[in-house]
Design a protein with these regions (language model features):
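Non-catalytic structural scaffold of enzyme domains
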Residues: 1-277
Length: 277
């Protein structure tokens, strides 16, 4: 169905947030080729149903596969929660059993026991990620002694997508959700940013955190997990091209994406506008 030639690593997100993961992966593995796809025209994914998120994510993965990607990272917690397993189990065997689609939730959960002293952890995420209970279920399987509290932060993604992460609205919504989750479980000592957009708010988040509570972002752990995965799967590593090239695709305005991406990457980039529906 797709070309068997070696190709780049694909990284997908519903918008800009996955760039925080892409940046950490590229820093850790600069020699590989990458294609980043942001479905900005249909963001946010958080409030959407399982069926819609699966359909959108499936379209994006197919697009990245058609561009030659052999491995795709869903750098979107909502897509990882609502679509990853179905794509892995239902679609990949028909498309190409040798290709892989990986998410960001499991690599994050694997670090949980190391980052918390009290073993009380808070997950800050979209409505879709929190309602799916993906984090709490994974943590319960790996670390049943850890207590997990989830907090849906529906306005945080729009704040980032609209470049308003240092606005009065950001102050209001960040403080509101931090106060609430820490009142539900005052023993929380670690907050996990369970959405790849949220690292852009990390400075604002730290302003409103009490002493003794730390913030845990995903990017570097996903990057380390990917390096480990490729070391353990040399057959996949051989299918990846190395030239240090990066392409950026968006389903919305290329100019708008390029301008916003400079906030995430601190670099001007060329962007292609595409359609995937």
């Amino acid at each position: 169905m797709f070309s068997q030639k070696a190709g780049p690593i694909g990284i997908f997100d519903s918008g800009y947030g996955g760039l925080t993961v892409f940046d950490k992966i590229r820093q850790a593995m600069p020699e590989y080729d990458y294609i980043y796809l942001g479905d900005n025209a249909r963001t946010p994914y958080g409030p959407r149903s399982f069926e819609v998120v699966y359909r959108f994510t499936r379209q994006a993965v197919m697009k990245l596969f058609s561009e030659g990607c052999q491995l795709v990272i869903l750098a979107c917690n909502t897509a990882s929660a609502k679509a990853l397993r179905t794509i892995q189990q239902r679609d990949l065997p028909d498309w190409d059993p040798a290709r892989r689609v990986l998410g960001v939730i499991r690599p994050t959960v694997e670090m949980m026991d190391q980052v918390s002293t009290t073993k009380h952890i808070g997950i800050l995420g979209t409505a879709g990620t929190i309602s799916s209970h993906s984090y709490s279920l994974e943590i319960e399987k790996m670390f049943p002694h850890i207590t997990v509290t989830g907090e849906s932060c529906p306005m945080w993604v729009p704040l980032v997508e609209n470049n308003e992460f240092d606005s009065p609205g950001a102050d209001y919504f960040v403080q509101k959700h931090l106060d609430h989750i820490l009142s539900v479980d005052p023993r929380i000592d670690t907050l996990v940013l369970g959405c790849t957009h949220y690292p852009l708010l990390i400075g604002k988040i730290r302003q409103y955190l009490p002493q003794g509570v730390t913030v845990f972002a995903q990017g570097e752990y996903v990057a380390e997990s990917l390096k480990d995965y490729l070391n353990r799967h040399p057959e996949m590593d051989r299918r990846l091209t190395r030239g240090g090239e990066c392409r950026f695709l968006t389903t919305e305005s290329a100019a708008k994406f390029s301008e916003a991406a400079s906030v995430f990457l601190n670099d001007p980039i060329e962007v292609e506008q595409i359609s995937i529906d």
